[in-house]
């Protein structure tokens, strides 16, 4: 899959459909759903940068990332929304018996999400789920916290631990164990599917204001990510653009 350099991250040039098809056909692959926060943290932290760049797909989830790809490389890149990747992957795999495992979040969110998924996709095959305790990504990669995930051997493992913890967990998991499942860091998607949080309307996301919608819902947690990191993203992008 082709990719382009944005800040210091190699972002895949792809679509929602292509990522979903990739997850259906491949094994033992890793996918990071990247927004401006991902790229800023990777720019400032070489350890995170190297881990993210090792993923097989780095999908441009955020509007700023997709727009930057268009401006820098004159391509037709659109947002690869993690929420849409999640649903499209499930839809594409229904008739082939594709199996899914959910790792992260909490029991309330997971149970509500599974209820909603079973209503939307009555034939969905859920291999299992695990809601881990609050531990570091390194501790969570210990066998007692991943044994069920490994034993169930689902086609896709969806990981919702928040960035960068979920990506660091996936990296550690691949490094320590022989895993044939595809591993996808999916952020807040579990909560959106469970409807414990409200996802921004499509038109809001398409004009680049999804971050405002989310900031209003969680100002304390997301203040730094959206107000500081978004500003830094613009600065770093301008620097890259002027250096062309």
Stretch-by-stretch model annotation:
Residues 1-84:
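N-terminal nucleotide/polyanion-binding subdomain common to many enzyme families
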Residues 35-39, 161-166, 189:
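Short glycine-rich anion-binding loops that position phosphate/pyrophosphate groups of nucleotides
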Residues 64-70, 199-244:
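A transmembrane-helix-recognition feature enriched in membrane-embedded lipid enzymes
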Residues 65-67, 165, 189-193:
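Short gly/pro/ser/thr-enriched loop/turn and capping motifs at secondary-structure boundaries
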Residues 70-148, 152:
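Conserved beta-alpha
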Residues 114, 167-176:
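Short Gly/Thr/Asp-enriched flexible loops that form oxyanion-binding sites at enzyme active sites
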Residues 132-137, 179-217:
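Short, flexible loop segments at boundaries between secondary-structure elements
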Residues 149, 153-163:
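Proline-aspartate-enriched helix->loop->beta-strand connector
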């Amino acid at each position: 899959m082709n990719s382009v350099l944005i800040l210091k991250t190699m972002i895949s040039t792809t679509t929602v459909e292509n990522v979903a098809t990739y997850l259906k056909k491949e094994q033992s692959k890793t996918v990071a759903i990247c927004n401006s926060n991902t790229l800023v943290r990777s720019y400032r932290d070489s350890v995170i940068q190297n881990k993210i760049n090792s993923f097989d797909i780095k999908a441009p989830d955020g509007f700023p990332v997709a727009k930057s790809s268009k401006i820098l490389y004159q391509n037709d890149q659109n947002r690869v929304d993690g929420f849409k990747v999640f649903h499209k992957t499930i839809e594409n795999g229904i008739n082939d018996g594709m199996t899914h495992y959910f790792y992260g979040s909490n029991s309330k969110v997971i149970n509500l999400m599974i209820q909603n998924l079973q209503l939307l996709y009555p034939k969905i095959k859920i291999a299992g789920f695990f809601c881990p305790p609050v531990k570091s990504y390194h501790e969570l990669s210990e066998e007692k916290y991943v044994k069920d995930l490994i034993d169930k051997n689902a086609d896709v493992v969806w990981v919702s631990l928040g960035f960068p913890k979920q990506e660091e967990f996936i990296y550690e998991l691949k490094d320590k164990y022989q895993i044939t499942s595809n591993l996808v860091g999916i952020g807040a998607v579990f909560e959106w599917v469970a409807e414990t949080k409200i996802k921004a309307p499509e038109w809001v996301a398409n004009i680049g204001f999804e971050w405002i919608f989310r900031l209003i819902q969680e100002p304390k947690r997301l203040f730094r990510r959206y107000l500081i990191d978004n500003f830094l993203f613009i600065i770093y992008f301008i620097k890259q653009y002027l250096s062309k």
